[in-house]
Amino acid sequence: MCIRDRSAACRSLANEFGAVLLEEGCGLAPHPLLRELTSEISASKALTLLRLSGDAGVDESGEGSWMEALAAWRIPVLMLAQPRADGRFAGIVPASVAFARALNLSLLGLVQLGGEWDVPKRRTDGLPWCGCLQGPDDDPRGLISCLQHRQEVLARGEASGSV
């Protein structure tokens, strides 16, 4: 069984990390929420995962896009991507990574949702893949380990690599 639902994938990741999961739409103004979250996170030291629904690259609120705000606040971002039926990814995936890099966003990497995880193909993508969430029976330890390593790399100010 594959996780085809981003919300379920985020819940799974939050459970693995022991994190609080918040879900928001991209129509909300990003800066007030990020200001509140960063102060709460600083005070509690608890890991918080924020799942955004909608187009994070579009300024829906009139106060800047979520991508721009996340970059400005230096908040680490993990992108989730579903493969097409043929196993390849739509052009929006590398375009989103390029946009994130142009904004100097703290990109932890990409997680594939569902489909067959093909490491050689993911390496040829040249994208910062961390792993795949295929279903509730999977062992996500490799993905979690990759994400923890990428977080440490970002904390040291180094660039994250690819699979």
Give short role names for the model-derived ranges.
Residues E23-P30, I41-G62:
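Switch II (G3) loop of P-loop NTPases
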Residues E152-V163:
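C-terminal-of-GTPase-core extension/linker across diverse P-loop GTPases
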